[in-house]
Curated annotation (Swiss-Prot):
Keyword field: Cytoplasm, Lyase, Schiff base
Pathway(s): Carbohydrate degradation; 2-deoxy-D-ribose 1-phosphate degradation; D-glyceraldehyde 3-phosphate and acetaldehyde from 2-deoxy-alpha-D-ribose 1-phosphate: step 2/2
Protein name: Deoxyribose-phosphate aldolase
InterPro entries, A to Z: Aldolase_TIM, DeoC, DeoC/FbaB/LacD_aldolase, DeoC_typeI
Organism lineage string: Bacteria, Thermotogati, Thermotogota, Thermotogae, Thermotogales
EC number of the protein: 4.1.2.4
UniProt organism field: Thermotoga sp. (strain RQ2)
Amino acid sequence: MIEYRIEEAVAKYREFYEFKPVRESAGIEDVRSAIEHTNLKPFATPDDIKKLCLEARENRFHGVCVNPCYVKLAREELEGTDVKVVTVVGFPLGANETRTKAHEAIFAVESGADEIDMVINVGMLKAKEWEYVYEDIRSVVESVKGKVVKVIIETCYLDTEEKIAACVISKLAGAHFVKTSTGFGTGGATAEDVHLMKWIVGDEMGVKASGGIRTFEDAVKMIMYGADRIGTSSGVKIVQGGEERYGG
C-alpha cells in the first residue's frame, strides 16, 4: 500500500504540480505565532535556555525548541504561559534504532515536552525501505499519543521523489507535521521545498520550515509558500525586523 500511495503522489505531482504562493501575504502576528524559538547548539548552557524562554514569553512565540536535556528546565521557565516546549528525537542524524527513538520521545514527554521533532532515517528512505521508515515514524507517534509529532525529512539530502515519499509516509504513519531540516545538514529550508511538502500533505498536516531563516522577509516567504511553523534561532531579530518595517 505504501509504495502504491507514493507512486500515486509522484504521478499527480508530474501532472498537476504548480509552484505558486498558497496565500497572498503574512503579517507580524502571523510570523510571531508561527515561530519556534530554537537553540539546539551542542554548547548551549542552562543560562542560554533561560534566555531563550524569556524571549519566547516576551515575544509571544508559539514555542521553544531545545535539546532533550533542557526540556525540564524549559518547562519550568515557561510555567503558566501558552508557549510550547518542543524537543528533538533521533537528532540530528536520524540513524538511531526505532525503539531508541520511541523511548527518547517517551522520556521527553515525561520531562514536559509538548511536541516532538523526530528525524527520519534518511538512509532507509533513500534505499526505498518504505516499511522501515513507516514503522520508525509510527513507533514515535504511538509512543506519545496526544502529542504533536513532526518528522524532519532533511530535504537537502533528498531528490524530489524522495521528498514526496517522505511526506506520504509521514502522513500515513500519523505524524502531524513534516519539517524541512535539522539545521545540521548541508542546506536549510527553501520556499520550493516548503511548497512541495504542503502540496503533498495538504491541510491535514502542517509544515515546519527550519534552517537558514534569519529575517522577517525569509519568514514571510516561507509562510506564503505553505509553512505553518518557523524553526529559527533568530526569532527576536525576525520580529524586530517586521516591527521596524511595519510598526509594532
